[in-house]
């Protein structure tokens, strides 16, 4: 099942900066986004808890995390934030 998706403004600006400074990381993020929207097992991705309980997360490389929200009713994913795992949850 393929999901429709949007990128938050924050994530768009992060990707623009990374495309210039760290192209392999930007490519890894784009590859992971394509993998997620084409995934049949969207529940495979870890749900977060507490204040971020409506988000799921996926690791990119070892130290970075991409947060996203899934709306199964509308078959839509909002990719919201990307950052280092020490900073992303604040």
What are these regions (language model features)?
Residues 12, 49, 89:
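Nucleotide phosphate-binding site architecture
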Residues 20, 30, 37-38:
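Alpha-helix boundary recognition
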Residues 7-11:
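Basic, amphipathic "hinge/linker" alpha-helix immediately C-terminal to the N-terminal HTH DNA-binding motif
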């Amino acid at each position: 099942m393929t999901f429709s998706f949007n990128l938050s403004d924050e994530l768009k600006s992060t990707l623009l900066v990374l495309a210039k400074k760290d192209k392999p990381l930007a490519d890894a993020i784009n590859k992971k986004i394509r993998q997620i929207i084409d995934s049949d097992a969207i529940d495979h991705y870890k749900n977060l808890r507490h204040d971020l309980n409506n988000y799921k997360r996926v690791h990119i490389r070892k130290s970075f995390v991409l947060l996203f929200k899934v709306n199964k009713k509308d078959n839509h994913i909002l990719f919201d934030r990307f950052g280092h795992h020490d900073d992303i949850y604040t």
